[in-house]
């Protein structure tokens, strides 16, 4: 949602109320805190809420070009389009600056924007102190504001930004319900126009660039994984394999020797007993064979455990690398939004394409 209004109307404080935490810098003075479009978000009520706080367009003494760039930034941050434009007003009066702000947005966004506007009055606590309802207050506002409310379909709400806890949640929930109902009324569509369509196409192109860069980084990381595993495990595996092969060779030699001994004994007269020395030799070789078998089993087990550990490390490294890549994919849109917000990278390219809409 996009917060619109003059300096001192309570836009930033309202944004903090909606998000449930202080993310925008707000001030009770008349000085401008928000000098440039900025976005903040939070997860509340089972959904992700993204808010764009806009500067007071006609009371910050900015050049016309700067004003146009700020509106463009609003487009870039909220593409493919916002679900609501919130006109934040003080209860006290509907000023010339606020009228011109609305006119400026209608000029660049078209009359269709009225279908997405919601008027939000701040300082509801003043109404409560006076024992007045919001309906009572609306009857006293200037005719121009009443006409604007009519064009907006009568969508109006009041906030007390001093509330905390459940009371704060209740008024935010009421606003979100109003927005949800209006989304249904608009057949599930967010606000959009030709300018938004072109901005979205440029943003998607930039997203692809970001994702492609992430893919290249992912491939390089895969190569780095293999190098790290090779460095950590190759020498250990070679050493264990050599020991295994050496022991296996010794075992095979012992087995051949035993077979030769047994063959020699078989050709002797079966009635003759072998010498005590021959018996001891056969027993000794048998014990050596059993020792080597046991050693071979241990070496094989150690080698398999090391290979298993190597594979586990590989899978874990690849899992982390893949998760990092997925996060980069999911965050590609946020990266583009930040570039627009901070007037870096993509901002200049997109502004050069879209500034004709503001001429």
Model-derived segments and spans:
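Glycine-rich, N-terminal phosphate-binding loop of Rossmann-like dinucleotide-binding domains
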Residues: 89-90
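C-terminal non-catalytic interaction/localization modules
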Residues: 1-51, 58-66, 77, 96-116, ...
């Amino acid at each position: 949602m996009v917060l619109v209004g003059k300096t001192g109307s309570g836009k930033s404080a309202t944004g903090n109320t909606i998000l449930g935490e202080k993310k925008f810098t707000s001030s009770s003075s008349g000085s401008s805190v928000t000098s440039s479009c900025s976005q903040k978000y939070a997860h509340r009520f089972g959904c992700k809420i993204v808010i764009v706080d806009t500067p007071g367009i006609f009371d910050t003494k900015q050049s016309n070009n700067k004003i146009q760039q700020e509106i463009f930034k609003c487009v870039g941050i909220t593409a493919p389009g916002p679900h609501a434009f919130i006109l934040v007003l003080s209860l006290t009066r509907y000023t010339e600056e606020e009228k011109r702000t609305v006119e400026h947005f209608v000029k660049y966004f078209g009359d269709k924007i009225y279908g997405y506007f919601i008027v939000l009055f701040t300082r509801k606590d003043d109404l409560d102190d006076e024992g007045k309802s919001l309906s009572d207050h609306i009857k006293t506002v200037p005719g121009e504001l009443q006409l604007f409310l009519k064009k907006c379909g009568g969508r109006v709400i009041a906030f007390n930004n001093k509330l905390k806890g459940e009371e704060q949640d209740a008024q935010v929930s009421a606003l979100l319900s109003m927005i949800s109902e209006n989304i249904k009324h608009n057949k599930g569509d967010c606000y959009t126009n030709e300018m938004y369509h072109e901005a979205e196409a440029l943003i998607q192109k930039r997203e692809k660039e970001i994702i492609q860069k992430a893919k290249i980084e992912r491939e390089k990381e895969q190569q780095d994984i293999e190098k790290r595993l090779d460095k950590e495990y190759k020498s250990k595996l070679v050493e264990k394999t050599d020991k295994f092969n050496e022991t296996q060779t010794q075992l095979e030699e012992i087995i051949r020797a035993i077979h030769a001994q047994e063959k020699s004994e078989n050709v002797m007269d079966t009635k003759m007993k072998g010498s005590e020395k021959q018996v001891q030799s056969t027993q000794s070789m048998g014990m050596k064979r059993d020792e080597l078998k046991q050693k071979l089993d241990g070496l094989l087990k150690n080698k398999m455990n090391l290979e298993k550990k190597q594979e586990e490390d590989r899978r874990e490294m690849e899992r982390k690398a893949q998760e990092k890549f997925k996060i980069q994919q999911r965050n590609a849109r946020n990266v583009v939004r930040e570039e627009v917000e901070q007037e870096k990278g993509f901002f200049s390219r997109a502004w050069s394409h879209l500034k004709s809409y503001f001429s």
